[in-house]
């Protein structure tokens, strides 16, 4: 007898081994029709897989997150089916699931075009309409090699070569004449794949290495039903409207160009926005007891070897040489801050010591990974480091947590998730040290009374970290701030203090950033606010516009009055109709437009309009200044 325990605690008995689908059929026809896969004793399996022992079982349907992931994975295989029918000469590589979608890497002699993508999507729809079953066959390794050798799928053969010799059999999934190998599970029938859409094509490299051959990557998305797909498409359309590259160009904030890949050219208005963010964060440094420092851009590689970056990070570093010495352009600020700490003798009574820097860093990101100002090679961080005693970790992390939440709220983010990234496989130090560091972060968050999620293997090579994930206006999540506990680097770089027994000890080093990369944060702000920044943050807060030349001198005096109060203001004295000026500055998302005609000039007033089109009427310049000051203080 096989006893199957269901999630509600009920049990079903079967006289012989039984498949997941057969269990579902025994419960009801409706459930059987909805069954995508099963979870047996916590492990996902195909609906056709047989259970031959007493086990717990959860039926997976499209209502489950796991079900949607399986749908996406099966859609990737469906891409393969369609592509091989349309372009038999191409070679299939890999097709994994990613956030909200999937992709398939394919080797093709020629690049795919948008017309090709449309044809592939059409063929996928035709295949789905055939309502065929997806057949799984667990196949001996030697036979799998023979299958793909006969089909000329050289990349599949390379992938098999990479697998451990312990793997003697693997799953082959058949979509009619098309076959792919996979751990699975996959949908039992193509009827589950109707709510999909191919989204874009890009280039990629075999094994992610630019030295290898280029592949074609087809991206797509798939959902449980059409309603979810339509909602996703609407979100993507909204995201496209909010694209920071589009808004950055429209508002003349910045640009990027081929001669400087991953490096940003900031225009006056964009740099004004940068300065608002930087000055806000500089005040955070001051209010939190940080001394602002400035460290060199390049340092001899010997320092990076001592810090551990050379062994763990050199592939992402830029190097230069001079007078037979090799230097690294800094990818991080931490070793420099240790050098500042090391200049002088510190007592335990001096700790904690806090340093902050708007540190310019460079990382050799792959060109294919670059994305506007969200993923760049040159960036500036609001980077801070605290040198403290072990008993001070909790209070320092708690204070940082409260400050970070205040900053995110000020910039318009109120949905924040907290995660702890735990020890990675490649790391410095022993397990006891990591145990201590991870426990310190858990303890501090516990004191703060917040919930968190843990991410095994996601920590930095020198320590675990708290991550702050912010949800934006259209529901996307961005990872921003971090707080890391580091017991390693102070010892490696000789940071010491004298304890109460006159013994030299290494301090604990806390690495912290609230906004992280300034470039990335500004890109996120642009998209979150769709370019319509709150007035305190807007690069141009006010435009003063005249109706005729007769008001030009008064307009300039109003501009100067506002500028002298510290506001970011410009005057529009062009010989254009006032309606044209209003439209243009509204499209530029300027918070306030002050219109000046003869009446306003005579009365020493301005007519105030908001970018939303609201007419606030006529008021004195001093009254408008009070209004703007009140907004900024809020």
Curated annotation (Swiss-Prot):
Uppermost EC category: ligase
UniProt keyword Membrane present: no
GO molecular function per UniProt: ATP binding; metal ion binding; threonine-tRNA ligase activity; tRNA binding
Source organism: Xanthomonas axonopodis pv. citri (strain 306)
Family: Belongs to the class-II aminoacyl-tRNA synthetase family.
Cofactor: Zn(2+)
UniProt region (Catalytic), positions on chain: 243-534
Subcellular location: Cytoplasm
Name this polypeptide is given: Threonine--tRNA ligase
HAMAP family: Thr_tRNA_synth (MF_00184)
Record EC number: 6.1.1.3
């Amino acid at each position: 007898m096989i006893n199957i325990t269901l999630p509600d605690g009920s049990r079903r008995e079967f006289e012989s081994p039984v498949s997941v689908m057969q269990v579902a059929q025994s419960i009801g026809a409706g459930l059987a029709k909805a069954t995508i896969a099963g979870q047996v004793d916590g492990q996902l399996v195909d609906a056709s897989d047989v259970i031959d022992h007493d086990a717990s079982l959860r039926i997976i349907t499209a209502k489950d997150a796991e079900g949607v992931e399986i749908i996406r994975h099966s859609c990737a295989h469906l891409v393969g089916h369609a592509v091989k029918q349309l372009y038999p000469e191409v070679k299939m590589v890999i097709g994994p699931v990613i956030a909200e979608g999937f992709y398939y890497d394919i080797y093709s002699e020629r690049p795919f075009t948008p017309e090709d993508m449309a044809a592939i999507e059409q063929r996928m729809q035709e295949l789905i309409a055939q309502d065929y079953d997806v057949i799984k066959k667990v196949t001996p390794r030697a036979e799998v090699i023979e299958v793909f050798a006969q089909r000329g799928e050289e990349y599949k053969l390379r992938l098999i070569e990479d697998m451990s010799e312990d793997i003697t059999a693997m799953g082959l999934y058949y979509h009619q004449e098309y076959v792919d190998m996979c751990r699975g599970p996959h949908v039992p029938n193509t009827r589950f794949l109707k709510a999909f859409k191919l989204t874009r094509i890009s280039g990629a490299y075999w094994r992610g290495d630019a030295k290898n051959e280029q592949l074609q990557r087809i991206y797509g998305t798939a959902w449980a039903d059409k309603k979810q797909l339509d909602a996703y498409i609407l979100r993507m359309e909204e995201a496209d409207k909010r694209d920071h590259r589009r808004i950055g160009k429209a508002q003349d904030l910045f640009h990027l160009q081929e001669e400087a890949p991953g490096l940003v050219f900031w225009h006056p208005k964009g740099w004004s926005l940068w300065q608002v963010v930087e000055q806000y964060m500089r005040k955070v440094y001051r209010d939190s007891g940080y001394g602002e420092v400035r460290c060199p851009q390049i340092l001899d590689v010997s320092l990076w070897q001592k810090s551990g970056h050379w062994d763990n990070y050199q592939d992402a570093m830029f190097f230069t040489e001079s007078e037979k010495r090799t230097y690294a352009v800094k990818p991080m600020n931490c070793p420099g801050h240790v050098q500042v700490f090391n200049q002088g003798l510190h007592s335990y009574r001096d700790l904690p010591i806090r340093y902050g820097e708007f540190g310019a860093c460079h990382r050799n990101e792959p060109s294919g990974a670059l994305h506007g100002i969200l993923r760049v090679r040159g960036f500036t961080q609001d980077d801070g480091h605290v040198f403290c005693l072990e008993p001070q970790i909790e209070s320092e992390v708690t204070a940082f947590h409260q400050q970070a939440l205040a900053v995110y709220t000020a910039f318009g983010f109120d949905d924040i998730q907290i995660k702890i990234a735990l020890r990675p496989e490649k790391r410095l130090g022993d397990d006891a040290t990591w145990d201590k560091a991870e426990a310190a972060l858990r303890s501090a968050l516990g004191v703060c009374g917040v919930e968190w999620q843990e991410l095994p293997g996601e920590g930095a090579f020198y320590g675990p970290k708290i991550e702050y994930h912010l949800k934006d206006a259209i529901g996307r999540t961005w990872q921003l701030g971090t707080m890391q506990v580091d017991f390693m680097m102070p010892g490696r770089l000789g940071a010491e203090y004298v304890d109460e027994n006159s013994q030299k000890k290494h301090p604990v080093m806390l690495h912290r950033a609230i906004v992280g990369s300034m470039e990335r944060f500004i890109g996120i702000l642009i998209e979150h606010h769709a370019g319509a920044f709150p007035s305190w943050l807007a690069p141009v807060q006010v435009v003063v516009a005249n109706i005729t030349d007769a008001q030009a001198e008064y307009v300039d005096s109003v501009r100067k009055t506002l500028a002298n109060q510290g506001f970011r203001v410009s005057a529009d004295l062009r010989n254009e109709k006032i309606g044209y000026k209003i439209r243009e500055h509204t499209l530029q998302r300027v918070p306030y437009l002050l219109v000046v005609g003869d009446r306003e000039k005579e009365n020493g007033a301005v007519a105030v309009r908001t970018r939303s089109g609201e007419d606030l009427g006529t008021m004195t310049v001093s009254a408008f200044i009070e209004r703007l000051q009140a907004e900024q203080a809020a």
